[in-house]
Amino acid sequence: MTTRTKGRGHTAATTQNDRMPGPELSGWISEQLMTGRIPVSDIFCDIENNPGLCYASQMQQTKPNPKTRNSQTQTDPICNHSFEEVVQTLASLATVVQQQTIASESLEQRITSLENGLKPVYDMAKTISSLNRVCAEMVAKYDLLVMTTGRATATAAATEAYWAEHGQPPPGPSLYEESAIRGKIESRDETVPQSVREAFNNLDSTTSLTEENFGKPDISAKDLRNIMYDHLPGFGTAFHQLVQVICKLGKDSNSLDIIHAEFQASLAEGDSPQCALIQITKRVPIFQDAAPPVIHIRSRGDIPRACQKSLRPVPPSPKIDRGWVCVFQLQDGKTLGLKI
């Protein structure tokens, strides 16, 4: 054991076995450094004269005492070297994210403009549906006139004269008188061509609000029902049920012509078919304060599916002009009201 005294009066003890300092020596050196008893330069800068102490200080840096671990910040030169690469990577990543953001905004704008451009197509659906119905009626009328191959070359009177003379209709397209064809068909005239017979039957089953049947003084409940059905979308809805109730009560009170005129007037004003039916129940006198009819059914399954969501508990005094179409009464006595 040898003792060396340094110039400032501090004593350091070294042995050959102290080349590898233990935790006691490291802790002691840390304590002396923290209290200022040993200058920092003696430990870190005097490598040639005191290699043992410098080695101990180096070990102290790599293995700090738990008491001083959080009081000192160490910087690894490797981390310092790669910090610039991290910055460059983050910068390039930010650039890519910015480009993606710009592309997303551009794509969103294009999608919005595309949606705006397709709105007229959505609006065309109602127009196409209306055209489809009108065209079906027009084709039936067109077939009845037997003009599918060209323009008519003769009047209805000339057609009748030719038919009476030759016992058969003239060749080519011709005009036919509806009443004359009806008479020939009802008399089972064999000279009526099958195509004319089918065309007449198709037109007879296609009823619509035209000038001809609008002025018809003796419209039947069946014709009025078919006319109203042609204007309603879907099948078996609450409004279809309302049509049946209106036609039934109108027939019983001989008010079919009034109902027909009211329906046509509402449509002419631009009302929807559903609105026109509601207007009938409010304007035609026979429906004011009228109780809805009672329909006896076996089970709820007998009610059309489209009406299921419109069923309500029956109030004490339901009225048609207040939206109550009819009352379904089951076999067990339970009642359900159809409300629109």
Curated annotation (Swiss-Prot):
Renumbered residue ranges of the record's region Disordered: 1-24
UniProt modified residues of type Phosphoserine: 187, 205, 208, 317
Top-level taxon: Viruses
CDD domains: V35-RBD_P-protein-C_like
Database matches in Gene3D superfamilies: Filoviridae VP35, C-terminal inhibitory domain, beta-sheet subdomain, Filoviridae VP35, C-terminal inhibitory domain, helical subdomain
Location of cross-link Glycyl lysine isopeptide (Lys-Gly) (interchain with G-Cter in ubiquitin): 309
InterPro entries: Filo_VP35 (IPR002953), VP35_IID (IPR031163), VP35_IID_b-sht (IPR043061), VP35_IID_hlx (IPR043060)
Subcellular location: Virion; Host cytoplasm
Post-translational modification remark: Phosphorylated by host IKBKE. Phosphorylation contributes to efficient viral replication and transcription. Ubiquitinated by host TRIM6 to facilitate virus replication.
Keywords assigned: Coiled coil, Host cytoplasm, Host-virus interaction, Inhibition of host IKBKE by virus, Inhibition of host innate immune response by virus, Inhibition of host IRF7 by virus, Inhibition of host RLR pathway by virus, Inhibition of host TBK1 by virus, Inhibition of host TLR pathway by virus, Interferon antiviral system evasion, Isopeptide bond, Phosphoprotein, RNA-binding, Suppressor of RNA silencing, Transcription, Ubl conjugation, Viral immunoevasion, Viral RNA replication, Virion
GO CC terms in record: host cell cytoplasm; virion component
Location of Phosphothreonine modifications: 206, 210
GO biological process: symbiont-mediated suppression of host cytoplasmic pattern recognition receptor signaling pathway via inhibition of IKBKE activity; symbiont-mediated suppression of host cytoplasmic pattern recognition receptor signaling pathway via inhibition of IRF7 activity; symbiont-mediated suppression of host cytoplasmic pattern recognition receptor signaling pathway via inhibition of TBK1 activity; symbiont-mediated suppression of host toll-like receptor signaling pathway
Domain VP35 IID stretches: 215-340
Pfam families in alphabetical order: Filo_VP35
MF (Gene Ontology): RNA binding
Coiled coil location: 96-116
Family membership: Belongs to the filoviridae polymerase cofactor VP35 family.
Assembly, per entry: Homodimer. Homooligomer; via the coiled coil domain. Interacts with nucleoprotein NP and polymerase L; VP35 bridges L and NP and allows the formation of the polymerase complex. Also interacts with VP30; this interaction is regulated by VP30 phosphorylation. Interacts with host IKBKE and TBK1; the interactions lead to inhibition of cellular antiviral response by blocking necessary interactions of IKBKE and TBK1 with their substrate IRF3.
Described purpose of this protein according to its UniProt entry: Plays an essential role in viral RNA synthesis and also a role in suppressing innate immune signaling. Acts as a polymerase cofactor in the RNA polymerase transcription and replication complexes. Serves as nucleoprotein/NP monomer chaperone prior to the formation of the large oligomeric RNA-bound complexes. Regulates RNA synthesis by modulating NP-RNA interactions and interacting with DYNLL1. VP35-NP interaction controls the switch between RNA-bound NP and free NP and thus the switch between genome replication and genome packaging into the nucleocapsid.
Protein name, entry field: Polymerase cofactor VP35
Organism: Zaire ebolavirus (strain Kikwit-95)
